[in-house]
A protein has these predicted regions:
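Conserved alpha/beta core of the MobA/IspD/sugar-nucleotide pyrophosphorylase nucleotidyltransferase superfamily
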Residues: 1-3, 167-250
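N-terminal nucleotide-binding beta1-loop-alpha1 segment
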Residues: 1-18
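Conserved N-terminal catalytic core of the sugar/cofactor nucleotidyltransferase
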Residues: 2-5, 32-102, 195-197
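Phosphate- and divalent-cation-binding pockets in alpha/beta enzyme and binding domains
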Residues: 13, 60-63, 115, 184, ...
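Short catalytic helix/loop segments, enriched in acidic residues and glycine
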Residues: 20-36
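Conserved beta-strand segments of alpha/beta enzyme cores
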Residues: 25, 73-75, 216-218
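Conserved beta-loop-beta/alpha segment of the NTase-like Rossmann-fold superfamily
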Residues: 62, 69-149
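Conserved core of the sugar-phosphate nucleotidyltransferase
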Residues: 113-192
Length: 250
């Protein structure tokens, strides 16, 4: 199993002071960067093959890897046009996506309980899997995951008013793909780039993968497990004061 961590973006909505600007994966909680937390949680799940998709201030991420002396050292793939969007970032890691075996595709800017990692990586059988949190705040920001008859049918911030579903929640931003699934997603992403849609979020390509219906996808319910995606200044405070106290020491 291989983990691909998407950490190329600048995170403009976080509004960091210019002298303090860091890639979001280098934000610290409990004295540990999000990057180190990802690596520790992946190792605890038996995942040592890690690829980092980097862009903005990538040298700071490399310096953090030097500081913690993480071995085996994660591979690094650079997206020099990171400002375009995450579809292009996923396209830059196409080789890692299609190298074989199950692939975990993970946003870097998430602080989360180890139960979420366990749900993502559970089982030795190859599978496609998405994580659902039914306890989410309504609004335009969460990426909603809609499920009907156990099958994911929608993955978007904005939903059609007449959409019929059995369950709805927020997508945690972590996905698992088996080898055929990863190859198909890489092909969809390549089509996006070739058709001038590289500026779109990669969830749009994942949505297409789900809606094709040609690959079975499991939905793992992680409701009740603490996590937060860090996009805005208030998210940093919530991560430190609401989520971090619920996490087990790493």
């Amino acid at each position: 199993m291989r983990a691909i961590i998407l950490a190329a973006g600048r995170g403009m909505r976080l509004k960091q002071a210019e002298e303090d600007q860091l890639p979001k994966c280098l934000l610290r909680f409990g004295g540990m960067t999000l990057l180190e937390r990802h690596l520790r949680l992946l190792r605890s799940a038996g995942v040592e093959d890690v690829v980092l998709a980097l862009g903005w201030r990538h040298e700071l991420v490399s310096a953090e890897l030097d500081r913690i002396d993480w071995q085996p050292r994660p591979g690094i793939v650079l997206n020099p046009r990171y400002e375009l969007g995450s579809v292009l970032t996923v396209h830059t890691v196409a080789e890692a996506m299609t190298r074989g075996g199950d692939v975990l595709l993970m946003d870097a800017d998430v602080l989360y309980h180890d139960r979420i990692m366990a749900a993502l990586t559970a089982g030795s059988k190859p599978t496609n899997r998405v994580l659902l949190d039914r306890d989410f705040e309504a609004g335009d920001e969460p990426v909603k995951l809609c499920v009907r008859a156990g099958v994911p049918i929608e993955l978007r911030k904005q939903l059609a008013p007449d959409l019929k579903y059995d369950a709805i929640g927020e997508s945690v931003g972590f996905f698992r793909f088996d080898e055929p699934g990863a190859r198909r997603l890489a092909a969809i992403v390549s089509d996006y780039v070739a058709s001038d849609r590289a500026h779109l979020p990669h969830e749009e390509a994942v949505r297409d993968f789900f809606r094709e219906g040609s690959h079975a996808v499991e939905v793992a319910d992680v409701t009740g497990s603490a996590w937060i995606e860090i996009d805005f200044p208030n998210d940093v405070s919530r991560a430190a004061h609401e989520v971090l106290p619920q996490l087990r020491p790493l």
